[in-house]
């Protein structure tokens, strides 16, 4: 997680948890004047639109006071969804046996894009079975990771 995203997660964790939700993760996508801050929340019984609206008001109030982003951006608060992004070792460990899609910073086995089943998480290392081959990826090498939804 980038430094700004880490700082934002630390800043927003308590206010989101005060509403009874879990702060699942943060994505900040810079695109000039059209930057987007995505805040993913989850709850024991899932998340509905009213939950997102309440969390958005709380998050917006904190961001207005703390002002961690100096440029213009759009705030989006949502559920992680069925193809949820994964951010932490604990989140990856919770989905051992499930299929994921990873975008890497540095290639592993000649590729920056991997699809496979999580076989283990050991500290900051993720083991993945890709096309019958076991690969190990450092979590800090993962630019983006998502579950692959099964229908």
Swiss-Prot record:
Signal peptide: none annotated. It comes from Shewanella baltica (strain OS155 / ATCC BAA-1091). This is Ribosome maturation factor RimP. Transmembrane segments: none annotated. Pfam families: DUF150_C, RimP_N. It comes from the Bacteria. SUPFAM superfamilies: YhbC-like, C-terminal domain, YhbC-like, N-terminal domain. Required for maturation of 30S ribosomal subunits. One of its GO terms (biological process) is ribosomal small subunit assembly. The gene is rimP. InterPro entries: Ribosome_maturation_RimP, RimP_C, RimP_C_sf, RimP_N, RimP_N_sf. Belongs to the RimP family. Keywords: Cytoplasm, Ribosome biogenesis. The lineage of its organism: Bacteria, Pseudomonadati, Pseudomonadota, Gammaproteobacteria, Alteromonadales. One of its GO terms (cellular component) is cytosol. It is found in: Cytoplasm.
